[in-house]
């Protein structure tokens, strides 16, 4: 399982190698020069050496060490984003364009690694990194349980089912075309983002209710005698390169599908 997870992470980073993060003054030297790619590579090397030794990740430093490594990855991302904001200055335009897309692309490189947005030259092969880290954390929690507790905590063994069936997939600007920004205006989602060495595509990881699922007629497990239920797709804001009605190009927060929830109403007259 651990080897599979590392393979997924390496595959994920390979999708982003065409768009390296911009070097920020004062963030060079030491382990910061390597960045989170170096930390991930070190984790992969440790796991590989551990699996060759005794067949378990513990021989390469232990699963807790690996967890700390990926926590360091997230910390580095947050630190780099904060330093990038300082470099832009307090008067910099943070949300509604300005300065041209090419200039903004470099200053917003840190945003390429948001949880549900990626800028890449090919379709991402795996879910966003933060989703993989969450799944891996759940795996570590299960690994620390006894076999008996692990069996009883398995959702499949307990008969757990989702209230609403959902699907998640990467989509492009060609699929979205338009979106609603934070001011309620309809904007055009640009397919390509100018970068230093060319252009890359924007990808969005969307989650919505499955129209072919078993919950299209209502939520699972709800007493239909007393409640009306419906599975509905909800949205959240992410940052993307867009163009407004005045043909002004800039980075804006737009709404994309991010979850499928159950809504209930009480039946009247009961």
Curated annotation (Swiss-Prot):
Chain segments annotated as coiled-coil in the UniProt record: none
A cellular-component GO term for this protein: axon
Signal sequence annotation: 1-18
Residues that make up the propeptide removed upon maturation: 19-151
Glycosylation sites noted in the Swiss-Prot or TrEMBL record: 144
Alphabetized UniProt keyword annotations: Cleavage on pair of basic residues, Disulfide bond, Glycoprotein, Growth factor, Secreted, Signal
One annotated GO molecular function: growth factor activity
UniProt-listed InterPro entries: Brain-der_neurotrophic_factor (IPR020430), Cystine-knot_cytokine (IPR029034), Nerve_growth_factor-like (IPR020408), Nerve_growth_factor-rel (IPR002072), Nerve_growth_factor_CS (IPR019846)
Location in or out of the cell: Secreted
Pfam families for this protein: NGF
GO biological process terms held by the UniProt record: cell surface receptor protein tyrosine kinase signaling pathway; modulation of chemical synaptic transmission; negative regulation of neuron apoptotic process; nerve development; nerve growth factor signaling pathway; neuron projection morphogenesis
Keyword Isomerase: no
Family of this protein: Belongs to the NGF-beta family.
UniProt name for this protein: Neurotrophic factor BDNF precursor form
The organism's taxonomic lineage, starting at the top: Eukaryota, Metazoa, Chordata, Craniata, Vertebrata
Gene name for this UniProt entry: bdnf
């Amino acid at each position: 399982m651990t080897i599979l997870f590392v393979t997924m992470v390496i595959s994920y980073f390979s999708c982003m190698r065409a768009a390296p993060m911009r070097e920020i003054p004062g963030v060079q030297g030491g382990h910061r020069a390597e960045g989170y790619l170096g930390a991930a590579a070190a984790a992969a090397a440790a796991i590989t050496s551990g699996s060759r030794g005794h067949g378990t990740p513990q021989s390469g430093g232990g699963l807790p060490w690996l967890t700390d490594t990926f926590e360091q990855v997230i910390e580095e991302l947050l630190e780099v984003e904060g330093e990038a904001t300082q470099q832009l200055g307090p008067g910099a335009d943070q949300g509604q364009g300005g300065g041209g897309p090419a200039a903004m692309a470099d200053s917003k490189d840190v945003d390429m690694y948001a949880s549900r947005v990626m800028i890449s030259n090919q379709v991402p092969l795996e879910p966003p990194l933060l989703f993989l880290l969450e799944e891996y954390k759940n795996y570590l929690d299960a690994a620390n349980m006894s076999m008996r507790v692990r069996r009883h905590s398995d959702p499949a063994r307990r008969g757990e089912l989702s209230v609403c069936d959902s699907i998640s997939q990467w989509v492009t600007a060609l699929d979205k075309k338009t979106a609603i920004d934070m001011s309620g205006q309809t904007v055009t989602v640009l397919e390509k983002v100018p970068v230093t060495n060319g252009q890359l595509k924007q990808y969005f990881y969307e989650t919505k209710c499955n129209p072919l699922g078993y919950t299209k007629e209502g939520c699972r497990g709800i007493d239909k005698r007393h409640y009306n239920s419906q599975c509905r797709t909800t949205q959240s804001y992410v940052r993307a390169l867009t163009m407004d009605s005045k043909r002004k190009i800039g980075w804006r927060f737009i709404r994309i599908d991010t979850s499928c929830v159950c809504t209930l109403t009480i039946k009247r007259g009961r």
